[in-house]
Amino acid sequence: SCNSNEWDVTSDLNVDSVDPTIGLTPLAEAPHMDYAPLYWSVYGALRQQEKDASFPNIFTETDWDNAINYVANNLKSHGYDMLVTDGFASMSGDNGYMTRYSHTLKNDNSPEVQLSTIISKLNAKGLKLGVYDSPFWLHYTNPNAIIPGTDNITVGSLRYDSKKDKDIKHPTKNDQFGWVVTDHPGAEQYFEGFFKHYSDMGVKFIRMDFLSWYEDGMNYTD
């Protein structure tokens, strides 16, 4: 969860001289926080479109309105206070991080729904937004976006560069995602900026996936 500013989601995005998490109590271990969040996910609707090969998968503002009303009227009283995105729709942003989610028409050139719009709709019903994302992923629209806290280091420079990056376990494989190469300059600031971005926006939960892919290039089922 990123609903606590205990970690380094401040305006100081300089490289840390020491690990900022040392000595902190994880939020999940804090009093009265020993439970998993209860939320409704867009996964089912988008996964069905994937199975039907009805591309691009979309979840429109009207879909959000219907889902939000359903959760508010039927699930909120049972503790469900959040709706969460998934990975089966477009994820983009011009500042290096996700600010838009899902096209609005079955057309890759159609507008996308602004996360800020979704958050406003949720707030009006006393609900929260969670996102499916990872600081290891790059899904920007503008590769020249400057990483906050750096001296003009661009987001695009964090990608794998075959001319410089030689210690690669599977050099002939194609990436299913754009991954951050963590020893590139600016990677730490990008990671800290990732959590600050969502914290500032009002996102309250981040679902992360496929971390094992980053470690060794393999899925846990392989």
For each feature predicted by the language model, list its residue ranges.
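N-terminal Sec signal peptide cleavage junction
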Residues: 2-4
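Conserved structural scaffold segments of CAZyme catalytic domains across common CAZy folds
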Residues: 7-130, 134-140
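Aromatic- and carboxylate-enriched substrate-binding clefts and catalytic-loop regions
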Residues: 82-222
